[in-house]
Regions:
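A nucleotide-sugar donor-handling region in carbohydrate enzymes
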Residues: 143-212, 235-239, 353-354
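Nucleotide-activated donor-dependent transferases that construct or modify glycoconjugates
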Residues: 1-14, 198-199, 312
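Active-site and donor-binding regions of nucleotide-sugar-utilizing enzymes
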Residues: 8-30, 38-181
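Catalytic binding pocket for nucleotide-activated donors in carbohydrate/polymer assembly enzymes
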Residues: 294-362
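Donor nucleotide-activated moiety binding/catalytic core segment of transferases
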Residues: 246-294
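C-terminal alpha-helical cap of glycosyltransferases
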Residues: 367-387
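Structural loop-to-beta junction motif characteristic of Rossmann-like glycosyltransferase folds
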Residues: 121, 287, 303-307
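Short hydrophobic signal-anchor/transmembrane segments that target glycosyltransferases
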Residues: 23-27, 210-229
């Protein structure tokens, strides 16, 4: 009897798709596996189809709808919480009940078991970012039947915290890297020969640099003539005006981006296009400027200078949640940015050794593609034939 595996894409943006869609391409090779791709928006389906190519003809796509009432309520409730995503789960229980296994790049879907009673459905979680912040190690992670992990650092910490076991986890690498070579330099996005900085603030309301420093950072770059700037925040930052953190009990208002930066030839502003998710900007820049985004680990596939903004004056030095801040210089104020950029240019290799070691521990890399390793881990864990 075939093993029916569902891949769910249920988010407001497209940044999670590349983390699990490549696995579909490898799973269709298994004779007794049926694949169902469940999407909650036409944009999600279009992106999955684009990424998996010819494999799309060998899977079944199912569009999930949240219902009219939920869509109306989401206009208000969705400003501060993932209301629509939860409504999609609740409104499509028969579709999920028909599956044997559900593969997801997030943890909201565990509500299908914990709140909506689908006790027989088994869950697989693929990391949608390789970072080490505390949010990755929440208790809900222990509810997954199988965790597909990018590398030894996150695996060892999850096992130490009792969130998984060697039997319920597998090191598979990073399927997103099967869609793009992270170490290959991208084409230059400016023609003026200046070094390019990518500013990549997160949306988390307590730790993001955007809410307290962001406009000052943009103003500084707007008024100088030494650097180009790519402003490429986490794609969720500009999806909502209100950002709330249950973990830190903090809520912040995200103001609109001022028009004064538009048209400046040395500044590129992108609040959420496909290029924000396909590593276009990470591959094209010379210096990374950010805070807590896990994209820093994609950045160090090719070691380069990094600067981290710490507006909350976090005591980070001995905190595992901020391990990535050891990969560059940390500054607490925008006034310190010019000197930090000078040091980044004059000592480009200063953090190379730390970055190379972090990459090795964060990503398990073998001759076999990560997506193939992930597909095999799923089939071996839940039962199935050889391809």
């Amino acid at each position: 009897m075939p093993l029916t595996i569902g891949f769910l894409f249920n988010h407001d943006a497209l940044h999670q798709v590349r983390h699990s869609a490549p696995v579909i391409v490898e799973l269709v090779a298994y004779r007794h596996v049926d694949i169902v791709v469940l999407t909650s928006s036409p944009a999600q389906e279009q992106e999955v189809r684009r990424l998996i190519g010819d494999a799309a003809s060998r899977v079944r796509f199912e569009a999930l709808d949240a219902g009219v009432t939920a869509k109306m309520l989401d206009r208000i409730l969705g400003l501060v919480a993932p209301f629509r995503r939860i409504a999609v789960l609740r409104s499509n229980l028969p579709s999920f009940a028909a599956l044997d296994v559900l593969v997801v790049p997030e943890s909201t879907s565990m509500m299908l078991r914990d709140r909506f009673g689908l006790d027989q459905l088994r869950f697989v979680r693929i990391q949608h970012g390789p970072g080490h912040r505390s949010v990755i190690f929440r208790p809900v992670i222990a509810r997954f039947d199988l965790l597909l992990l990018s590398g030894e650092t996150v695996r060892d910490r999850m096992i130490a915290l009792g969130l998984t076991t060697p039997e319920r986890s597998a090191l598979v690498g990073y399927p997103k890297f099967d869609t793009v070579d992270p170490a290959a330099p991208g084409p230059p996005l400016f023609g003026n020969g200046r070094p390019t900085v990518v500013y990549n603030p997160h949306f988390e309301p307590r730790l993001s640099s955007w809410f307290d420093m962001g406009l000052a950072v943009l103003d500084w770059f707007a008024g100088q003539d030494r650097f180009n700037l790519i402003f490429a925040p986490h794609v969720m930052l500009f999806q909502r005006h209100i950002h709330a953190s249950v973990e830190h009990w903090r809520m912040r208002w995200r103001a609109a981006l001022p028009k004064r930066y538009q048209g400046l030839p040395h500044m590129l502003l992108d609040t959420g296009s496909q290029r924000s998710t396909d590593m276009t900007y990470m591959r094209a820049a010379d210096i990374y400027l950010g805070d807590i985004s896990s994209q820093i680990y994609e950045w160090i596939a090719r070691p380069r200078p990094a600067i981290f903004l710490n507006p909350s004056h976090v005591q980070w030095q001995d905190n595992a949640d901020f391990a990535h801040w050891r990969l560059g210089e940390v500054i607490d104020a925008v006034d310190a940015l010019p000197a930090a950029l000078d040091r980044a240019l004059s000592a480009r290799e200063a953090f190379r050794a730390q970055q190379e070691e972090a990459f090795r521990k964060t990503f398990s890399v073998t001759q076999e593609p990560a997506s193939r390793r992930a597909a095999r881990a799923i089939v071996e864990h839940f039962g199935g034939d050889e391809p």
